[in-house]
């Protein structure tokens, strides 16, 4: 209603003026009091709602000035480059309504320019950890799942700090394109080795360990690769096409040489043949240049990689337009449901097996079979050797509440934690190997597509980004090189946490 009819309003005013002439106990007076009271409550309720909305708008504007709370950011998409805040100065502003810090849980109102969900003290600590470095010159590192997202940022830290780094991925050519595209790649690309492998296939994992061990002492193992929610095969279409396209020449990229690349058979299949039961055979390694089906132009593959490294590639607007490519180079899965919300009897047996092989069995095989190489590094003069098992809160037993969803990923991470807790003490006492499990923090939202878009539209964003996740994984190595022996711990937000 825009306005009250003037004649009716005049009648109402006339009646109100007559009310005081009646006896206070008159029925008409009581009726008018009830009506006036109801009207006053409605007006008061409406005003409270307006004030609440004004406060929410004020606070949301401050949140959106931050890097992690920006409207351009959704899920784990971070443009493949560091996030940027639009705030001027160290802080984005002051909230009217206090919110709890993601790390320390204390309420705060002063919002950091970068982190929308951290109090000033925890934000300052996180900034310092994001930038910490250590000298790894001459050391060798093996990093699984190093092509994109957290893995890419871990690999960049290792390479920029001087380590000779071997990364594994199911899409090795995409990895080469990504790393070669970095502005400073000429400084370290010659120390990168890319291994195309499917960690869900134990025969390939064993072949990988043999290949790594043959190269001599190994200083660092980071078991980062994992399968959380199985994507539809179509999500990988562009990446698979890119594996059939030729790589650019080193000269065109402005570098002396491309990284060494080794690939195994059938690395890009939807499911490992051994697990699916279709066939089984021995994994065979192929070095770069041996097989080249260039059915599609390399330009298209490079374009898809560039999209994954472009700001806003997976923004809410891009999702709604159907053009989104996330930081991993994947097409978003638009299924109404996925295994993140599935309960015990709903999880597909094949996905159950894949998750166990990738998330816990592959790390077990890698750690056990490469232990002699780690021992050799210490014997050759290294202060310590390192194993970092990238875990998650899903594998923690001490949480007060466990929801019924994704039991298969929970049990895989719990197994990884138990391997760490069981073996870390003995490995340190015997061989001076520091093994820890690390939670990367809340970076990704694994909920089904429609729900993810809904909460993004409402202004929700994960509190941390990919660089924060990488910093948490890298931290035990930095601290170890500084003389602090962290082992047998489950680290959350850089501190030991209950198992």
Which residue ranges define each predicted feature?
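Short cysteine-rich clusters marking metal-coordination/redox-active sites
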Residues: 101-104, 119-122, 387
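Canonical Rossmann dinucleotide-binding motif of NAD(H)/NADP(H)-dependent dehydrogenases/reductases
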Residues: 127-172
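SDR active-site lid
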Residues: 403, 407, 424-425, 429-483
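C-terminal helical subdomain
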Residues: 3-25, 262, 269, 274-312, ...
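N-terminal alpha-helical interaction blocks
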Residues: 1-98
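Conserved glycine-rich Rossmann-like NAD(P)H-binding loop of the short-chain dehydrogenase/reductase
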Residues: 161-178, 193, 220-225, 233-259
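Catalytic Tyr-X3-Lys loop
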Residues: 238-364
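Active-site helix of classical SDR
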Residues: 367, 412
């Amino acid at each position: 209603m825009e306005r009250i009819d003037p004649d009716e309003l005049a009648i109402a005013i006339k009646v109100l003026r007559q009310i005081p002439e009646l006896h206070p106990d008159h029925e008409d007076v009581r009726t008018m009091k009830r009506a006036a009271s109801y009207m006053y409550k409605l007006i008061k309720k409406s005003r409270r709602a307006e004030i609440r909305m004004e406060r929410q708008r004020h606070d949301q504007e401050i949140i959106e000035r931050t890097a992690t709370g920006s409207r351009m950011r959704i899920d784990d998409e971070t443009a493949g480059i560091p996030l940027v805040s639009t705030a001027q100065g160290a802080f984005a502003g002051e909230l009217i309504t206090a919110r709890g810090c993601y790390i320390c849980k204390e309420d705060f109102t002063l919002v950091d320019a970068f982190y929308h969900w951290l109090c000033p003290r925890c934000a300052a600590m996180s900034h310092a950890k994001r930038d910490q470095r250590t000298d790894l010159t001459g050391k060798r590192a093996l990093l699984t799942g190093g092509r994109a997202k957290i893995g890419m940022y871990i690999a960049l830290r290792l390479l920029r700090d001087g380590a000779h780094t071997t990364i594994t991925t199911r899409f090795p050519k995409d990895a080469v394109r990504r790393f070669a595209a970095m502005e400073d790649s000429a400084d370290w690309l010659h120390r990168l080795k890319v291994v195309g492998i499917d960690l869900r296939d134990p025969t390939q994992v064993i072949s990988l360990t043999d290949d790594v061990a043959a190269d001599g002492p190994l200083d660092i193992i980071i078991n980062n690769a994992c399968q959380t929610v199985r994507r539809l095969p179509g999500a990988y279409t562009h990446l698979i096409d890119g594996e059939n396209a030729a790589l650019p020449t080193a000269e065109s990229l402005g570098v002396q040489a491309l990284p060494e690349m080794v690939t195994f058979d059938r690395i890009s299949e939807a499911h490992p043949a051994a697990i699916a039961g279709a066939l089984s055979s021995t994994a065979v390694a192929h070095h770069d240049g041996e097989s080249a089906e260039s059915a599609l132009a390399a330009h298209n593959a490079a374009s898809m990689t560039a999209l994954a490294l472009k700001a806003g590639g997976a923004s809410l607007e891009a999702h709604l337009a159907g053009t989104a490519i996330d930081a991993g180079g994947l097409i978003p899965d638009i299924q109404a449901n996925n295994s993140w919300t599935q309960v015990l009897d709903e999880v597909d047996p094949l996905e159950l097996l894949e998750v166990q092989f990738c998330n816990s069995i592959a790390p077990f095989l890698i750690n056990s079979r490469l232990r002699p190489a780690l021992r050799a590094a210490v014997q050759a003069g290294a202060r310590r050797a390192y194993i970092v098992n990238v875990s998650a809160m899903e594998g923690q037993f001490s949480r007060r509440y466990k929801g019924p969803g994704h039991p298969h990923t929970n049990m895989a991470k719990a197994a990884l934690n138990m391997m760490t807790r069981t073996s870390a003490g003995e490995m340190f006492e015997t061989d001076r190997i520091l093994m820890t499990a690390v939670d990367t923090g809340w970076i990704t939202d694994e909920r089904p597509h429609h729900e993810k878009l809904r909460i993004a539209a409402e202004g929700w964003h994960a509190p941390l980004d990919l660089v924060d996740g990488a910093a948490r994984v890298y931290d035990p190595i930095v601290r170890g090189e500084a003389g602090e022996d962290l082992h047998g711990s489950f680290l959350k937000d850089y501190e030991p946490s209950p198992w």
